[in-house]
């Protein structure tokens, strides 16, 4: 009996764009490609250092796609994103190539009318201001899930 291994792709647009965060969670860095998710907006969230996306016509979110994500890794990402996000299937445009369209998964903020969403979240600002503390939190999260130790 041969088992079929399902591989997934996941569009990430926040803290998971940082290789160090992904390495702590998956114990590896998957193959990636830059991508854009049309008709969504990336918001900051009051009191949080990570972003949320919700549908927004005529807007787009830049991020990247993680390729070759296993079922187990997808479960880890589901746990990491928690109940505040819903995993949804979306279509992104790969920006490294010829704007190829790709069906993929992403995590959308569950509460679409959340009054705590505001402005636009900035990855570069997050890296400078919050990444160090976020890595510490992510490492603790990985340890709680008994994930394999990363080199970080």
UniProtKB/Swiss-Prot annotation:
Pfam families: GGACT (PF06094). Expressed mainly in leaves. The active site is at 81 (proton acceptor). Gene3D superfamilies: 6.10.250.210, Gamma-glutamyl cyclotransferase-like. InterPro entries: AIG2-like (IPR045038), AIG2-like_dom (IPR009288), GGCT-like (IPR013024), GGCT-like_sf (IPR036568). Belongs to the gamma-glutamylcyclotransferase family. Putative gamma-glutamylcyclotransferase. This is AIG2-like protein D. It comes from Arabidopsis thaliana (Mouse-ear cress). The gene is AIG2LD.
